[in-house]
Amino acid sequence: MRANPHPLLTALAAASLLLSACNSQNDSNSANAVSPSGASVSSSEVTTSNPNLKLDLSCDDATFPSTLFAQCEQTNVAHTFEATQEQLNPAFQQRLQAQNAANLQASLERSINDPSWNLPPAYGNTGVTPLCAAGFGPCVGDPFRYPGVDGPDGNTFYQKEAEVVPVVYYDQGCARISGHVWRPRNAGNKKLPAIVVKNGSVQASEQLYWWAVQALVRDGYMVLTSDPRGQGQSDAATPTGEQGGNLNGAVFFQGLVNDIDFLLSSPNKPYPHQAQCAGTYPTKTASFNPFYDSLDANRIGLAGHSYGAGGVTWVQSYDAPDSKPWPGLLTKKNPVKVIVAWDALGSRETPNAATLTSLAGSGSAGALPSNPLTAPTDAPPVSARVPALGFSSEYGFTPVPFVRKPPREEHLAAFNQWSAANVPVMQITIAGTTHLDYSPGFGLPASSWCPKIENNACVGGWAKPMILHYTLAWMDRYLKNPDEPGYADADARLLDDTDWASRLSFHFASARKFTTRNGQLIQSDDIRALYR
């Protein structure tokens, strides 16, 4: 996407990166405040966890155009180049190249052992397509998070912390879906809450989300990951040629319903599409969830990125009075209890609300476009049915400085829909982030996610720790039982802004509205403004 050169870009380029960041903290107490947008916020949210937190909101208040706006924006957009700079580390490059070779070898061996994965070219499967079928380059994700890698996120995780089983199962069109089921090791007889993770489009593969999956497993969750039809190691098309991926956005919600059915399946309730499609290919396919005996079917959550965030927004809507009935085949009612949408939670007006660019508003050209030839035609109307946490990026796919003063409430459409329905909701926009902060991979513009390599693992980062903090706290708040780790302090984690308020966007308001377990209503349409 191109824009005519703007004179402000020259000023931005010349602005000093050493100027004080707009998000500094000091130890003054916060009281009732007025947000930069003029909306009132409640001092009751300044909890005992962060009573002395105060932010410098000069960047929030900066007018456009101005020298201050240019200085703030120059510092902010610099975050989007951190990841690619970190990846020049020789230790990262060495591990990446080793995993490139290992993934390519595994892909070739799969094709040799089961040639049916090499479908006629018209179907799109060739051994190295779909794009991430061979799992190299950006498709590797974090190269330290694979079995066989010495380190806490490699061998230690797979041998001591988790059980991970690869699975292949059919979708409703008899395309093969490649995925994994994960659970904490030594779960014993415990019934576990479960999360289904749905990839983004543009060929994102499941490995790009293992950074979040490992954290969920460590937090006590069973997790189902897979590549949607048309992406990664799944079939590019059905046997009749029906496409997936961006050519058929329905796979991001219809496929998610299939995923939920597979999660719920057991020997007594086999996965329905297995019987329908068995024998289509010689590939060994699963009839049921291998960890069915550990699943608590009453505690299921969803997390999705990009088109997958649109998918979780749609799927949670099923069974709402103003939407469509639940289409799953193993339960009569929608079993989803909570969702997290990584860029972004959709609204009825804009179901796919992902930020694509800083050059246009996210409610218009910046939102995920719908091709009238391929856009879903039977998606359920978006309805606020279950608690939802939404994240939005600032720069989308284009790490280009803002040449406008965006409306502060621009990312709050879904928040407002959930809030009006009195359904718990939280919306977070992290400063200096791109759409690819949620699917980090080699060469992809994003904020820092591997600033240090310690014990053969990526440590630290800008947005990643914050995304994990709120994702885990939100899931724990609505899925954990009282006797499980994460239950007791979930509310406190959602309200503890000490480490994170300074990383919230100064362009766009972040907001929250939910009731704590002790009955306190928490409501703010601008979290940063609490700490003026």
Task: Specify the residue positions occupied by each region the protein language model found.
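The feature captures the conserved acid-bearing segment of alpha/beta-hydrolase catalytic domains
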Residues: 327-435
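Short substrate-entry loop that stabilizes the transition state in hydrolases
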Residues: 187-192, 197-235, 348-349, 398-401
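Bacterial signal peptide processing site
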Residues: 23-26
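C-terminal motif of bacterial Sec signal peptides marking the signal peptidase cleavage site
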Residues: 18-21
